[in-house]
Swiss-Prot record:
Signal peptide: none
Subcellular location: Cell membrane
Keyword Flavoprotein in annotation: no
Extracellular domain ranges by topology: 1-72, 130-141, 209-226, 349-359
Domain of life from the UniProt record: Eukaryota
InterPro entries named in the record: 5HT_7_rcpt, 5HT_rcpt, GPCR_Rhodpsn, GPCR_Rhodpsn_7TM
Binding annotation for serotonin: 151
Entry's free-text remark on domains: Specificity for G(s) G alpha proteins is determined by the length of transmembrane regions 5 and 6 (TM5 and TM6).
Protein name: 5-hydroxytryptamine receptor 7
Organism whose genome encodes this protein: Xenopus laevis (African clawed frog)
GO cellular component: plasma membrane; synapse
Residue stretches spanning the membrane: 73-97, 108-129, 142-167, 188-208, 227-249, 323-348, 360-383
Gene3D superfamilies, per the entry: Rhodopsin 7-helix transmembrane proteins
Disulphides: 144-220
Gene that encodes the chain: htr7
Length: 425
């Protein structure tokens, strides 16, 4: 999200301090008196430059790669970018063309894919070029501000969307009958709009005077102002991460409690057959009372099984969605936490004008964060059968009748579930 690039025009300051051979007038001076005298040829400017060289050179380090390293790094980063574009584009296309996937809760999935796709298209290519030329910003001061704005807004939108998804899944599991947003497309669209509005609130301050970006020759770095750093990292990462962890902790507890209520036992399929309702006609009237009572109990149990089987299906589907999003949140934390820890500490260690952190470390953690935009669609495709099937059909250019094929596959899966010996204790 945050990019720091280094200037190449800085050179070490070489200072030569000359002292003349002491004359006879100086020979009688005490050693302490002689040492306090200023060297004869040393100027005020030399002393000022000497004091500056005692401080760490900020922004001097470059990424120096050999030809082979540049090729390998360029290929790897380009593959990450291309796969990120392809994966997130497939998610958006799949939700748009498949009726089964056009659910209000999937608006958030599309928003997440759009944010990740924007990172891959508008941010990653410029970071690749900057890294391959050693860390120098080659695109000018004006575009530096545009680039930082796109970087911050898209990455923040991705993170905040994950946060809203966690809240959506939690409410969907704990309040499946009363949570209206899952059936209300307009309300979900408003939530997506709020996510992008909050992302813009972090992007705009440096463009309007508060906490200006570090934008000098061949250097493009987001503002290192202390207040802005605390505000931006808290809103963009720490608060959303805390909300996600709390939501999934509650989801885990709720799923565990629900699992205890939905223990499965094998119930003989005899009681689900229609023949059970005809037994009383085959028995004598006087000997039918106990049998009739048993038949009524079995009939009620059979009806209860059929009624609750639908609830079981919903319960399993929500559990799977929670597990999928739990993995996504875990991947998000792994990818972004190291970078944001470094970004938060950087201005307090290096000051507000530049970065003194090891450049290779910064770039590695930055690309680890960008990789999260690649991981998200892969996780969805792996855990969502409908999305995975749609991906496969799109990659094989089988666009026609895709909704019909998905409906047939879903019906086949439903029949397989119906044939299982399931019940509720």
């Amino acid at each position: 999200m945050l990019i720091q690039v280094q200037p190449s025009h800085l050179t070490d300051t070489n200072l030569s301090l000359h002292s003349a051979k002491p004359s006879s007038d100086h020979q009688n001076l005490l050693p302490s008196e002689f040492m306090t005298e200023r060297p004869l040829n040393t100027t005020e400017q030399d002393l000022t430059a000497l004091n500056h060289t005692e401080k760490p050179d900020c922004g001097k380090e470059l990424l120096l790669y050999g030809d082979t390293e540049k090729i390998v790094i360029g290929v790897v980063l380009s593959i990450i970018t291309l796969f990120t574009i392809a994966g997130n584009a497939l998610v958006i296309i799949s939700v748009c063309i498949v009726k089964k996937l056009r659910q209000p809760s999937n608006y958030l999935v599309v928003s997440l894919a759009a944010a990740d796709l924007s990172v891959a298209v508008a941010v990653m290519p410029f970071v690749i070029i900057t890294d391959l030329v050693g860390g120098e910003w080659l695109f000018g001061k004006v575009f530096c501000n545009v680039f930082i704005a796109m970087d911050v807004m898209c990455c923040t939108a991705s993170i905040m969307t994950l946060c809203v998804i966690s809240v959506d899944r939690y409410l969907g599991i704990t309040r499946p009958l009363t949570y209206p947003a899952r059936q209300n497309g307009k309300l979900m669209a408003k939530m997506v709009f709020i996510v992008w509005l909050l992302s813009a609130s972090i992007t705009l301050p440096p463009l309007f005077g508060w906490a200006k970006n570090v934008n000098v020759e061949r250097v493009c770095l987001i503002s290192q102002d202390f207040g802005y750093t605390v505000y931006s990292t808290a809103v963009a990462f720490y608060i959303p991460m805390t909300v996600m962890l709390v939501m999934y902790q509650r989801i885990f507890v709720a799923a565990k409690i629900s699992a205890e209520k939905h223990k499965f036992v094998n119930i003989p399929r005899l009681y689900e057959q229609e023949g059970i309702y005809c037994l009383e006609d085959k028995l004598p009237p006087k000997k039918n009372s106990k049998k009739k009572k048993a038949v009524e109990e079995f009939a009620s149990l059979s009806k209860l099984i059929r009624q609750d089987r639908k609830n079981i299906s919903i319960f399993k589907r929500e559990q799977k969605a929670a597990r999928t999003l739990g993995i996504i949140v875990g991947a998000f934390t792994f990818c972004w936490l190291p970078f944001f820890l470094l970004s938060t500490a950087r201005p307090f260690i290096c000051g507000i004008m530049c970065s003194c952190m090891p450049l290779r470390l910064e770039r590695t953690l930055l690309w680890l964060g960008y990789t999260n935009s690649l991981i998200n669609p892969l996780i969805y495709a792996f855990f969502n059968r409908d999305l995975r099937t749609t991906f496969w059909n799109l990659l094989r250019c089988k666009y026609t009748n895709i909704n019909r094929r998905l409906s047939a596959a879903s019906m086949h899966e439903a029949l397989k579930v119906t044939e299982r010996h399931e019940g509720i204790l």
